[in-house]
């Protein structure tokens, strides 16, 4: 809990400018948590900066969603591109590789995670 305000922003869009791909949309988020003495407007600006950074990264999912998708990738295969590779993503990969018969590769330059 926080004594200040908090905000979460979501963007759902497609690579195509004409229409949203409802089967494979791109979902990115941005959030910020305030604290005592921080104006709500500043908290909102911080969340907007985060979602803008995620959109400009060209990723298909943000790092918060990416770490939750790791177990699904382990079970069904595939690949995702995220804005950054976090320690939580690495931890999820490590655990999945220990429990399941799966191996992951990470393209550190492009922030792409995939099963092999």
PLM feature segments, named:
Residues 1-116:
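Core subunits and conserved enzymes of cellular information-processing
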């Amino acid at each position: 809990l926080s004594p200040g305000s908090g905000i979460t922003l979501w963007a759902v869009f497609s690579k195509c400018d004409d229409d949203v791909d409802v089967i494979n949309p791109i979902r990115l988020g941005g959030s910020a948590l305030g604290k005592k003495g921080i104006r709500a407007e500043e908290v909102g600006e911080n969340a907007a900066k985060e979602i803008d950074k995620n959109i400009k990264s060209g990723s298909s999912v943000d790092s918060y969603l990416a770490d939750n998708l790791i177990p699904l990738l382990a079970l069904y295969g595939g690949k995702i591109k995220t804005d950054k590779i976090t320690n939580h993503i690495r931890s999820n990969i490590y655990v999945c590789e220990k429990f399941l018969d799966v191996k992951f590769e990470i393209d550190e330059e492009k922030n792409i995670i995939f099963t092999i």
